[in-house]
Each structure stands twice: as C-alpha cells, then as structure tokens.
A protein has these predicted regions:
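Catalytic cofactor-binding cores of redox enzymes
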Residues: 136-174
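A contiguous strand-loop segment
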Residues: 11-108, 136, 141, 328, ...
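Proteins synthesized as precursors that undergo proteolytic processing into mature forms
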Residues: 107-143, 255-263
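Short acidic-glycine loop/turn motifs at beta-strand connectors
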Residues: 22-25, 84-86, 158-162, 167-172, ...
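C-terminus-biased signal that marks the final domain/tail of proteins
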Residues: 8-27, 142-145, 150-151, 160-162, ...
Length: 339
C-alpha cells in the first residue's frame, strides 16, 4: 500500500461536506474531496453478510442491508457514507486534530472506529434506536490493519425524524442534535453552529436599506441579500454556505426534482482542480458527490470527471445473501448527444 494511501486513512486533511434534505422522501449524502481517487466502490452489504466485530465473539449475520460508498479490503466494506434498508444514513468526515478514540473498557460495548458505520446501520432502524446504541458504546482506537491506521473522523447520522453529530474527542464522547442537517470538518460542531450567528442577517430576498435609511442606496444586482455569505473552500465556510443553501432551498417533491436539487445543494461547495493546492502541482477536488434516497434505498452519485448522475438500487439485488455486492464507480464522462 502506498504511503499516501496510509496518509488518507490516517486522516489526511481532506475536506468533505455532508447534508440531509427532505421532500416527499428523505435524502442523505456527501462530497468527498481529495487529490486523487484510489479505488472506491458502491458496496451493498446484504442481510446475511457476516460481521465479525473486532471486540466481540459474536458473529452478526442477520441484520439490515446497507448500501454506500466504500473502500473494500479483504472483503470488508470500509464505508465513507451509507444508508440502510430502513432509511437511516451515516457518514464519516475528517476531523483531524480533534478526533480521539478510547482504549477498550469492560463496562461498555467496544466498537472500533472503522466499524462504526456498519455497527450502527446493521442494527438500528431509526435514529431513536441509534441513540440508545450510542449510549452504551465505547469507540476504540483499534486499527483495521497495519496499513489502515485510525482515520480521524466525526460522523453525521440521520433519518427522516432528525439528525445527530457524533464527535469522540479527548474530553469525551459527544452526541449533538443537528438542526441544520449539515456537517463539514473542523472546528467542532458546537463552534460551527455558533458561527451561524454571524450570518443571521443574510437572506435570499433583496435587502432593505438599514445602513442609513436617509441615504439613497440601490440594489444594483440580484442576490445582494446574501452579501457576506462565505465562498472560500475552508470547512467553516463550507458549513455556512451549505447550511444557507439547504435551509433556503426550494424544489418539487418528485424523485427527479429532489435528487437534482440535492446535487445542486452540495454543488455549491464543489472543489475545482486548481483552487485548493495541497502540494506542488497537486490539488484537492470533489472526487464524488452522493445522494441517497434513504426511503427507497437508492444510491445516486456523480464524480469529478463524470457529472452524469448514476444510481444503484439496493432493492434490485437479492439482499438475502452473504457476499458483498460491488459496483465500480463510473469515472468517464458520459455525454448525451442530441443529434
């Protein structure tokens, strides 16, 4: 395994953005931003796939099916983001410098960081059930293997009823309600939420002159109600921009309208090659964007090179099997000629 691969899994400072969206159905997805792709796949974990959780003698081979984007190693899905067949979604995003995990303890259920997503999604049908699971677990610093150190992450967990953020830090294991349904990277979630106070005057409507009512000022362009909305690629700015975009978003409630709108929401923080230099002649880009219809079990995605929306429907597969079902990520741009 290349050293840079190990760097990524250890928590290299890549940037990501996750969001939820609700119309008639519930949608959940994220961007994954990094300087190169190294072999992601869409992975369906069927109901009878045997999970051998690292700190348990029990094999979990009867559970909810899961679909998501993963790096697969030794037939194990290392999920970045996923939903289960019941409509619960979860994603891990980089949290470098703040994430800290515990040693195993005797009075709680010990769960390795790399198995956190499948541990929750395989057993919990709802956010309420997940809360109960979280209250009795201990997130450990156990590595997947020598080549896969613990990634420094925090997590967004959501269903149609609400959204949580989970952060394991040196000062403890924190679970936060997330009223905006958005997560990026640093700083910790309470600080991300607090910074929204700075932008409460922003609006999608044209501004009124409160600067000096006696002074004749003109709105010389559309969109001036959102002057001051951050536009850079830092994690704090992306949090604010996607929160504003999502909270003011309007769309129809059909599947096509909802999916299209979700990609537009996360598209507001797309990273273009050349705008975020991480080393000489190396640039972070949005490798992929996902959108899951958590109700229907459909995983939609596009990539930096292929902006066509592609989809895998978990319910078109036999979910009562034991082996992972794998689909390659379609990276080549697909253009529909009309003549």
């Amino acid at each position: 395994m290349k050293a840079i691969d190990k760097y990524f899994f250890a928590g290299g400072k890549n940037m990501c953005t996750a969001a939820t969206y609700k119309t008639k159905d519930f949608y959940f997805g994220r961007t994954l931003d990094y300087e190169f792709s190294y072999g992601n796949e869409i992975a369906i974990t069927p109901r009878n796939y045997p999970f051998h959780f690292r700190h348990s003698d029990r094999v979990l081979d009867k559970h909810y099916a899961i679909i998501g984007m993963a790096h697969i190693s030794d037939s194990y899905p290392l999920y970045y983001d996923a939903i289960n067949e019941k409509g619960l979604g979860m994603a891990g995003l980089n949290f470098v410098g703040n994430a800290a995990y515990a040693n195993p303890v005797s009075d709680k259920e010990n769960i390795a960081q790399f198995e956190f997503i499948p541990w929750i999604l395989s057993q919990c049908a709802t956010l309420k059930e997940a809360r109960r699971k979280l209250s009795c677990m201990n997130l450990t610093n156990t590595q997947f293997s020598e080549n896969f150190p613990c990634a420094q992450l925090h997590w967004i967990l959501a269903d149609t009823s609400g959204c949580l953020v989970i952060e394991s830090m040196k000062d403890g294991f924190h679970i936060y309600d997330n009223p905006v349904g958005v997560l990026t990277n640093n700083p910790p979630f309470p600080q991300q939420m607090f910074q929204l106070n700075n932008y409460q005057s922003l609006s999608p409507r044209q501004p009124k002159n409160t600067f000096a009512p006696g002074l004749e000022l003109q709105s010389y362009s559309r969109g001036m109600g959102a002057l001051g909305l951050p536009g850079d690629l830092s994690s704090a700015s992306r949090f604010t921009k996607v929160a504003f975009t999502k909270m003011n978003s309007r769309s129809g409630d059909s599947e096509l309208e909802s999916v299209s709108q979700f990609f537009h929401i996360l598209g507001s923080v797309d990273q273009q090659r050349g705008c975020c230099e991480v080393a000489e002649n190396k640039y972070e880009i949005t490798l992929y964007t996902s959108c899951c219809n958590a109700i229907k079990g459909i995983y939609y995605y596009n990539t930096y090179e292929n902006h066509q929306i592609n989809a895998v429907d978990m319910h078109r597969e036999n979910l009562d099997t034991t082996a992972l079902i794998r689909y390659p990520v379609l990276e080549t741009q697909n253009i529909l000629f009309q003549n």
